[in-house]
Curated annotation (Swiss-Prot):
Keywords: Lectin, Mannose-binding. Mixed specificity lectin with anti-HIV activity. Binds to HIV envelope glycoproteins, including exterior membrane glycoprotein gp120, and inhibits viral entry into cells. Binding to gp120 is dependent on gp120 being glycosylated, and is inhibited by mannose, glucose and N-acetylglucosamine. Belongs to the jacalin lectin family. This is Griffithsin. It comes from the Eukaryota. One of its GO terms (molecular function) is N-acetylgalactosamine binding. It comes from Griffithsia sp. (strain Q66D336) (Red alga). Residues 1-120 form the Jacalin-type lectin domain.
């Protein structure tokens, strides 16, 4: 069954999607680029773009967050890894043995929140 968990704060403008991901980060996440669309600010360093293969999905994900998204990392069902990108602030939350269906969120000058839609295994 599909469920979701929201991390981070209440600011920013909403977005959603999921076929490729990149981030801009320094001590926290300035922006997330999903399917080539930039959500957030222009600070920080740009990560390589992670493009999902056929049948590939996020199976384990760790997000550090407080009022903003501080750090993100994930591993796919095919063993490929992304991150960690960002800093050590906020509290860590891990989603394990999941199939991430969609990533929604909100962003302004920084990445305010992520709302992860997933199936639990």
């Amino acid at each position: 069954s599909l469920t979701h968990r929201k991390f981070g704060g209440s600011g920013g403008s909403p977005f959603s999607g999921l076929s490729s991901i990149a981030v801009r980060s320094g001590s926290y996440l300035d922006x997330i680029i999903i399917d080539g669309v930039h959500h957030g600010g222009s600070g920080g360093n740009l990560s390589p773009t992670f493009t999902f293969g056929s049948g590939e999905y996020i199976s384990n994900m760790t997000i550090r967050s407080g009022d903003y998204i501080d750090n993100i990392s994930f591993e796919t069902n095919m063993g490929r890894r992304f991150g960690p990108y960002g800093g050590s602030g906020g509290s860590a939350n891990t989603l394990s043995n999941v199939k991430v269906i969609q990533i929604n969120g909100s962003a302004g000058d920084y990445l305010d929140s992520l709302d992860i839609y997933y199936e639990q295994y």
